[in-house]
Amino acid sequence: MKTIMIAFIRGYQKFISPLTPPSCRFYPTCSQYGIEAVKTHGALKGGWLTLKRILKCHPFHPGGVDPVPDKKQKH
């Protein structure tokens, strides 16, 4: 599942993103954030973090640096 999600995001980066002007107000970009989130947290939690990030990407949010949170260690 992780591989499929990352392939989908990479497809977006390669084929769709170049057709639109740069508009992401965050660093890293939302698509790069999605890849990092899925790699770090897996498909379910990484997908959820990516969805939350995309929903924040609008003109009324200031944006800025928003890294993927670290994976919490189980004790």
Curated annotation (Swiss-Prot):
This is Putative membrane protein insertion efficiency factor. The keyword Membrane applies. Could be involved in insertion of integral membrane proteins into the membrane. InterPro entries: Membr_insert_effic_factor_YidD (IPR002696). Pfam families: YidD. Belongs to the UPF0161 family. It is found in: Cell membrane. It is a peripheral membrane protein. GO terms for cellular component: plasma membrane. Its main location: membrane. Keywords: Cell membrane, Membrane. SMART domains: Haemolytic.
